[in-house]
Swiss-Prot record:
Catalyzes the conversion of (8S)-3',8-cyclo-7,8-dihydroguanosine 5'-triphosphate to cyclic pyranopterin monophosphate (cPMP). This is Cyclic pyranopterin monophosphate synthase. The gene is moaC. It catalyses: (8S)-3',8-cyclo-7,8-dihydroguanosine 5'-triphosphate = cyclic pyranopterin phosphate + diphosphate. The active site is at D129. Pathway: Cofactor biosynthesis; molybdopterin biosynthesis. The keyword Transport does not apply. GO terms for biological process: Mo-molybdopterin cofactor biosynthetic process. GO terms for molecular function: cyclic pyranopterin monophosphate synthase activity; GTP 3',8'-cyclase activity. Substrate binds at L76, C77, H78, M114, E115. Signal peptide: none annotated.
Length: 158
């Protein structure tokens, strides 16, 4: 792990990292997020009785769209040509929550960690948005990188 912030230059100013000379490699990142809610809210999602429609399908599409738009949201993030984005949602009724996992892949010069994190985050936010009419105190938590492969820094896994 490095002890240098790559997005801060010698003058202390934020800048986009120059990846021109970096090698193109296969890159992959996985992330997760959780959204906790009342059992009644989760049951509405699981039974398909939510008045706004299929919450998981909408959250999945939102997460995929968000991964593709990450560079528009994170100021110093490079625009990337993603080759795969996967968002999975798992109801965990024993914990009154939904686990969201994301996977992003590409062949490129920079990693896809931010895309994976953005996908999981926006999927969780979409669940919140769709369910806020029935519950406003849902909690989004534990947004984190699970695994990253490729590039100079190598393999990272929680």
């Amino acid at each position: 792990m490095s002890n240098v912030f790559t997005h801060i230059n010698a003058d202390g100013n934020a800048h986009m990292v120059d990846v021109t000379e970096k090698a193109v490699t296969e890159r992959e990142a996985r992330a997760e997020a959780f959204i906790e809610m009342a059992s009644t809210t989760l049951e509405m999602i699981m039974s398909g009785s939510h008045h706004k429609g299929d919450v998981f399908a909408t959250a999945r599409i939102a997460g995929i769209q968000a991964a593709k738009k990450t560079s528009d949201l994170i100021p110093l993030c490079h625009p990337l040509m993603l080759t795969k984005v996967e968002v999975d949602l798992e109801a965990q009724p024993e914990h009154n929550r939904v686990r969201i996992t994301s996977l992003c892949k590409l062949s490129g010069k920079t990693g896809v960690e931010m895309e994976a994190l953005t996908a999981a985050s926006v999927a969780a936010l979409t669940i919140y948005d769709m369910c806020k009419a029935v519950q406003k105190d849902m909690v989004i938590s534990q947004v984190r990188l699970l695994e990253k492969r490729g590039g100079k820094s190598g393999h990272f896994k929680v």
